[in-house]
């Protein structure tokens, strides 16, 4: 099927622009893996596509801004095209602000409070539009109450932004997640384990 112009290629999926009934959309298509048996590969891709759309709908239902899902194919998700700028392209002054990282922290706090772990929460998966920020790419997201998984989400963001930016992110996060103290404790444990492992490899 011709999905239109390609916007990006990833390890798991490709992203295309698509227009239907006068509406601009983004189509995320999960690619087959040649190393897997076709029947197994189809089953995995079908399940992951459904799960991603389901988690996006759950996030939207609790007030997190995510691209609206218009339709679901066997291996594809047709969703709203968010007009704006990827946060990964912003200058530090604009990125490290309450409007961007502060709001992103609030949204992740809401997600964690509702049992959603993003799995790849970095500025590259934040879109900044005229009416606020959007969290995108739920391809690695899980429904999980694991404090470890939530701590890893925070670690990913901490490693991706400045100290000041992460501080603003945490302000927003703590304001929306009543269990943030437990997650922050686990974050410190994860970091200590990482330092120990690094020393062991030296």
Protein language model regions, located:
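Short glycine/proline- and charge-enriched loop/turn segments
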Residues: 33-40, 85-88, 137-139, 154
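ATP-binding glycine-rich loop module of kinase domains
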Residues: 3-50
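Conserved structural core of kinase catalytic domains
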Residues: 31, 45-49, 53, 60, ...
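Conserved kinase catalytic-core helix
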Residues: 58-64, 88-124, 129, 133, ...
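Structural motif
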Residues: 21, 72-74, 129-130
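Acidic active-site catalytic centers that drive phospho-/nucleotidyl reactions
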Residues: 28, 52, 120, 137, ...
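C-lobe/activation-segment region of protein kinase-like
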Residues: 134-202
């Amino acid at each position: 099927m011709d999905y239109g112009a390609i916007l990006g290629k990833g390890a798991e999926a490709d992203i295309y622009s698509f227009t239907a009934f006068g509406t601009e959309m983004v189509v995320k298509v999960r690619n087959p893996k040649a190393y897997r048996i076709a029947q197994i590969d189809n089953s995995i891709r079908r399940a992951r596509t459904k799960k991603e759309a389901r988690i996006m709908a759950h996030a939207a239902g609790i007030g997190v801004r995510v691209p609206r899902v218009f339709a679901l194919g066997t291996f594809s998700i047709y969703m709203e095209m968010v007009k704006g700028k990827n946060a990964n392209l912003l200058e530090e002054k604009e990125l490290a602000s309450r409007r961007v990282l502060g709001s992103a922290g609030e949204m992740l706090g809401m997600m964690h409070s509702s049992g959603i772990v993003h799995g790849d929460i970095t500025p590259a998966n934040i879109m900044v539009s005229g009416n606020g920020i959007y969290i995108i790419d739920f391809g690695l997201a899980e429904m999980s109450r694991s404090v470890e998984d939530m701590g890893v989400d925070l670690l990913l963001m901490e490693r991706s932004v400045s100290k000041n930016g992460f501080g603003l992110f945490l302000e927003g996060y703590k304001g929306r997640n009543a269990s943030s103290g437990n997650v922050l404790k686990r974050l410190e444990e994860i970091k200590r384990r990482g330092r120990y492992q690094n020393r062991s490899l030296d």
